[in-house]
């Protein structure tokens, strides 16, 4: 990949001039000028996902210049570099090949001239066999009872992705009860224990290194809880499996090495749900549905690699975000799925976006003087309408939004889904077009005085011109969800290429982990701590003065 500072490109300079010319443009006027704006600013994928980006503050010239920026930053060759196994994660000297995990064409993908697909397929085959044993009841616990509850213990990418997918695809769920534990706060796992029976519970310990502090703390607590009933450590092998690369520590824990599922250093944590980390997905939904998830993602991979930039959905989304973040100064982006099953989708994308592109050093090692990653947040509609939409409509911060909604519901109860769709479509229209003084004045009832009108009208005006993308999915199926996740993954990668940053490391996360280990040893003693700044010293020492006292109020 070439390391190109985007603000030094001709396209960036042209975009700045273009922005100065159209920064006051109204979305309302763009629609008046182009009766075919929806047709000209929308794209469809596989007759399953429609992207409508017409309600944005962009023109055909904006897009022309944004695509020119992508080409000048060598995006097509960067895409080819990732898919061909080049080590584009240079700070860790690794390839980035989560796309190989869902390579349903099974074409050769090589790292250092070695085809990795045989290893990928071997793990998938092992996952299929294991899932069939658990789901069928063939796998028995230590008292001979089949497994009924599964607990995935992991954090970050080992939790957010699998949890999001199993929730989003609950209509496809089988009889197994799936639980997720991530937080090192003992409350998280303690609350799970209340509903579990050691005789019928299986734990999945998801940690690449098998040393992640939060995961291993929870794993050992689960082990201790299990042994209080089972007593004999030999039974651990029937109730614990590992998703890891650290065979030695897995065996020391008591897990049978045959029950360790491998993945590789070319799989980043936040892109790992396609790997053995997705074992919880396959167990919860059945392996056939896990394969459909992979197939949908692979189909979007093919779209990303084979479609011209001008019609490429991930590229379009990425460029629009760069346009808002760098030229308009819109710093955040809301992800709003109008589907209750998708309630964890925004949290999942929050990690993907912010851990990938939350960088301030470019690929040349220089401090960046432009904007990189946006702040990603969101909640499901319609709940969010009664939470933060007031700010979206009338606040001083403009927040570009992605509205995601299925055309077909899994639960066609009365007119519920029609009302959900109506709210989704109406909100994007209201955000774009607003409500003018004239419109409000016309709605006043007869007999209202001019003075009364003037006193209230300013508070009711909604200026509109708030940009949105609408993503209409035919139905939230395993295939379509896979494609949707892949769409956002490639959006993130596209942004990183153009913004000249490394998207697949996370050194900021590593810093916090290291310092936490240092503080942990200090918390274990009664000694007064003075080695930090006054704030950290004060917090630690107050904790020590309070920890043995119960609340008397």
Curated annotation (Swiss-Prot):
A single GO BP: glucose 6-phosphate metabolic process
Annotated Pfam families: PGI (PF00342)
Residues spanning the membrane: none
GO molecular function: carbohydrate derivative binding; glucose-6-phosphate isomerase activity; monosaccharide binding
UniProt cross-references to SUPFAM superfamilies, sorted A to Z: SIS domain (SSF53697)
Reactions catalysed, as given in the entry: alpha-D-glucose 6-phosphate = beta-D-fructose 6-phosphate
Localization: Cytoplasm
Major subcellular site: cytoplasm
Entry annotated with the keyword Transit peptide: no
Keyword Metal-binding appears in the UniProt entry: no
InterPro entries: G6P_Isomerase, G6P_Isomerase_C, Phosphoglucose_isomerase_CS, SIS_dom_sf, SIS_PGI_1, SIS_PGI_2
Keywords tagged on the record: Cytoplasm, Gluconeogenesis, Glycolysis, Isomerase
Stated family: Belongs to the GPI family.
Function: Catalyzes the reversible isomerization of glucose-6-phosphate to fructose-6-phosphate.
Name listed for the protein in its UniProt record: Glucose-6-phosphate isomerase
Species assigned in the record: Baumannia cicadellinicola subsp. Homalodisca coagulata
């Amino acid at each position: 990949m070439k390391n190109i500072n985007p603000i030094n490109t001709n396209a960036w300079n042209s975009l700045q001039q273009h922005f100065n010319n159209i920064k006051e443009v109204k979305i309302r006027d763009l629609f008046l000028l182009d009766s075919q704006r929806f047709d000209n600013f929308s794209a469809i994928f596989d007759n399953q996902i429609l992207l409508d980006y017409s309600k944005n503050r962009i023109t055909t010239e904006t897009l022309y210049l944004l695509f020119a920026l992508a080409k000048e930053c060598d995006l097509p060759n960067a895409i080819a570099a990732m898919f061909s196994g080049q080590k584009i994660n240079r700070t860790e000297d690794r390839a980035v090949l989560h796309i190989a995990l869902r390579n349903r064409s099974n074409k050769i993908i090589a790292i250092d001239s070695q085809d990795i697909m045989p290893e990928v397929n071997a793990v998938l085959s092992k996952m299929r066999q294991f899932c069939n044993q658990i789901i069928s009841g063939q796998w028995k616990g230590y008292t001979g009872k089949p497994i009924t509850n599964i607990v995935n213990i992991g954090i970050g990418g080992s939790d957010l992705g699998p949890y999001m997918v199993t929730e989003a695809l609950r209509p496809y769920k089988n009889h197994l009860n799936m639980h997720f534990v991530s937080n090192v706060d003992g409350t998280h796992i303690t609350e799970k224990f209340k509903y579990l029976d050691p005789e019928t519970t299986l734990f999945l310990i998801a940690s690449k290194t098998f040393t992640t502090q939060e995961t291993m703390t929870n794993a050992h607590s689960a082990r201790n809880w299990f042994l209080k009933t089972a007593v004999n450590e030999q039974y651990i092998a029937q109730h614990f499996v590992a998703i890891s690369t650290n065979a030695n520590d897995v065996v020391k824990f008591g897990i049978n090495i045959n029950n360790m599922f491998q993945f590789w250093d070319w799989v980043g944590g936040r892109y790992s749900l396609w790997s053995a980390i997705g074992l919880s997905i396959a167990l919860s939904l059945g392996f056939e549905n896990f394969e459909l998830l992979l197939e949908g993602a692979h189909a979007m991979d093919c779209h990303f690699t084979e479609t011209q930039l001008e019609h490429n959905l991930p590229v379009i989304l990425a460029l629009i975000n760069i346009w808002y973040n760098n030229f308009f100064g819109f710093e955040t982006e809301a992800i709003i799925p109008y589907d209750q099953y998708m309630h964890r989708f925004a949290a999942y994308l929050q990690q993907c976006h912010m851990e990938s592109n939350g960088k301030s050093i470019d690929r040349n090692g220089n401090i960046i003087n432009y904007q990189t990653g946006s702040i990603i947040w969101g909640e499901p509609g319609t709940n969010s309408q009664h939470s933060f939409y007031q700010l979206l409509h009338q606040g001083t911060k403009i927040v570009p939004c992605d509205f995601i909604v299925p055309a077909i519901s899994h639960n066609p109860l009365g007119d519920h889904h029609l009302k959900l769709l109506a709210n989704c479509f109406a909100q994007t229209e209201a955000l774009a077009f607003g409500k003018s003084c004239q419109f409000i004045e016309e709605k006043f009832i007869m007999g209202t005085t001019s003075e009364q009108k003037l006193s209230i009208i300013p508070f009711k005006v909604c200026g509109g011109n708030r940009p949105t993308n609408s993503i209409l999915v035919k139905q939230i199926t395993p295939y379509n969800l896979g494609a949707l996740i892949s769409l956002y993954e490639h959006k993130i990668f596209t942004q990183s290429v153009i913004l000249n940053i490394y998207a697949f490391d996370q050194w900021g996360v590593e810093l916090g982990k290291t310092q936490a280990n240092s503080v942990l040893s200090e918390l274990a003693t009664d000694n007064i701590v003075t080695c930090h700044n006054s704030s950290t010293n004060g917090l630690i020492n107050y904790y020590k003065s309070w920890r043995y006292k119960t609340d008397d109020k």
